[in-house]
Amino acid sequence: TGINPLEGTDQYASISQNGKQVIQYSFKTGKQTAVLFDIDDTQGAKIDNFDGYIMSPDGKRMLIRTKTQPVYRRSYKAVFYIYTMASRKLEPLSDGGPQQAPVWSPDGTKVAFVRDNNIFLVKLLYNNSESQVTKDGLFNHVINGIPDWVNEEEFAFSHALTFNADGTMLCWLRYD
């Protein structure tokens, strides 16, 4: 997934050449400064490989993307895991099936995502409790939180949901 600057630091992260780690580097020296994720050094769930990651805004966790399946040009479904760096704990984001378009809350304590055209919310501070936000999603009729094919293609975006600045509200587009 290339070079990803780490917010509020002079560091960046990148997936290792062997695809087993997320490595932190210094922009100034280009040298490795830390291993942020190692597929062979986790507690809890075990995975054999991963396709990408999304760092939380507070830099304490990341979403690890596995089993990626393309939908359109930019969008995909995948099985995501929550990785907590301090404890090295790896746990599924959801047990309900592949997810699309996950987004972190600004404080890194919640993750919203789309599954089957509906939006779900996972609260990390409440034992990763999952709640369904929308219930009207219907294939080829109602789409919540992700763009339809035309909007993804013409406007080059694959996410249509976000949190407000303090993370207390979720905003999304609904297509019907």
Protein language model regions, located:
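Beta-propeller folds
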Residues: 1-176
